[in-house]
Amino acid sequence: MNKQNNYSDDSIQVLEGLEAVRKRPGMYIGSTDKRGLHHLVYEIVDNSVDEVLNGYGNEIDVTINKDGSISIEDNGRGMPTGIHKSGKPTVEVIFTVLHAGGKFGQGGYKTSGGLHGVGASVVNALSEWLEVEIHRDGNIYHQSFKNGGSPSSGLVKKGKTKKTGTKVTFKPDDTIFKASTSFNFDVLSERLQESAFLLKNLKITLNDLRSGKERQEHYHYEEGIKEFVSYVNEGKEVLHDVATFSGEANGIEVDVAFQYNDQYSESILSFVNNVRTKDGGTHEVGFKTAMTRVFNDYARRINELKTKDKNLDGNDIREGLTAVVSVRIPEELLQFEGQTKSKLGTSEARSAVDSVVADKLPFYLEEKGQLSKSLVKKAIKAQQAREAARKAREDARSGKKNKRKDTLLSGKLTPAQSKNTDKNELYLVEGDSAGGSAKLGRDRKFQAILPLRGKVINTEKARLEDIFKNEEINTIIHTIGAGVGTDFKIEDSNYNRVIIMTDADTDGAHIQVLLLTFFFKYMKPLVQAGRVFIALPPLYKLEKGKGKTKRVEYAWTDEELNKLQKELGKGFTLQRYKGLGEMNPEQLWETTMNPETRTLIRVQVEDEVRSSKRVTTLMGDKVQPRREWIEKHFEFGMQEDQSILDNSEVQVLENDQFDEEEI
């Protein structure tokens, strides 16, 4: 892979300083919550991956140390250890100057996904301390930094070595990451596993040395993205073996793997130089365009589509498709839309992917004739179902059919008085009794109430036309008013927030999961925008005294309960709420609906693959994966009165005081 490129001191280019990083970290790592925290690790890992991507080294070890710091070690060439043309040691330039990287101007890399150097300096700026150890040219070098990037030592030669590579250890700064500086093994695992899937020869080890959390996992996939697709489809009924294509066009390397399952949603994961492009881009467009064109040509050739028939829509062809599209693009062609590298803008990538897929897919379809015919028939059925769903939507939206909508919502929805969609909230409330209290206790101006009476369908297993037949889901679709599935338009939503409010028991949790499954599958932009919430009613009410001296307090956790019991002393009465219906309207407003005092959990999708796999595991047809997951993640000795707040993985937003970076 272009080994003549010279990764040396002079190949590191300096573009600008580091001043703004600590002041505005969100601009560089997205946020200072746990996503931003883990992003620090990815920046350093991506630098190590770049070495492997360009043919140097094949191992990366990531270790969460006992003191909460983290180490990333590779066996690449090792960072340059000489003096940079600016007069400073090159290592110091890499770790203290923003945009000092080996990728700029093609100095050290043909293809690069990490910002190689940008990442290193940003991580240093946001760390309490950072140390780098380099094995290069037979010597071991060491340099340390502290207090957000200031060198605390020069580059020191420590001894001799036969190895090559770089080891970076850092401890995040808790004055920047105020919520937590604790790394989550599972979050890191998903991302590292992804990197291993994308590079066949890469071996990654993840270690956790923290007391009580000791754990180790290895990731190495000889069949690369073929195994990635199998991993994503785990727990689903698949229709064939994974298909893979590789090729090169316009100097861009293209790898594609795909497999159909029996479900109704598509999952396309795209990558550029091993970095996930979660918002897609030109490479994804090229894949979809070629696939749609080739499938339609094939359908006409085998006479499943007649001359008079219109072409199959891409959405119908991709129903039940899981695909991974990975491209490697030379630096001079690489363009992203926006700062976060989440959407590819390189125009040549579209034609490159289109060319490779259009060249290879027809042969695959001819070779697998029986399967191909069944996939075409599947797409035709999807087209028919989509047409039926479209007609149902049009019926619901057209003026002449408004009576049906009014009938559907009659006696159910209690609307907000305001028409301000930027402020209005929709409460989905379990049961009639709680719905009644919510109607009386709400702020009529901006809060709408929709009680859920019947059974909510499990949308993981249902197709769109069946979902429309479920009264509860249909009512939610009409109430939100922004469409559903591929036709969902978030800007048309009648509400800024959708808040799920259920009892704090097993049935309530089940309703939450059913609703979240629906939102994740069919109104995903609403979840991605952070506009779906779970209301958190209190578990306990404590009351003491009478008349003017009467004091009423609420507790959401056992910890809060114990604190209040000590504070109130003897003589209080304690009520354990079993359901929302036990609260009168004033109590429900005060504890669960008042923006000044309520507690909400914002539902967020941090990792698309992880979220999708969890939904399949928990809501799919197969019992065994669900049983194994539950046994691994839940203690069945839990007391009935334990709260969701006791889960350290749940981030809670209290009193509606959202951080600017969380919104």
From Swiss-Prot:
Q: Which GO terms describe its molecular function?
A: ATP binding; DNA binding; DNA negative supercoiling activity; metal ion binding
Give yes or no: UniProt keyword rRNA-binding.
no
Binding residues annotated for ATP, in chain numbering: Y7, N47, D74, G114, L115, H116, G117, V118, G119, A120, K341
- For region Disordered, the annotated ranges are 386-418
Kindly report, in one word, the top-level EC class recorded for this enzyme.
Answer: isomerase
Subunit-level organization: Heterotetramer composed of ParC and ParE.
Name the record gives this protein: DNA topoisomerase 4 subunit B
Gene designation: parE
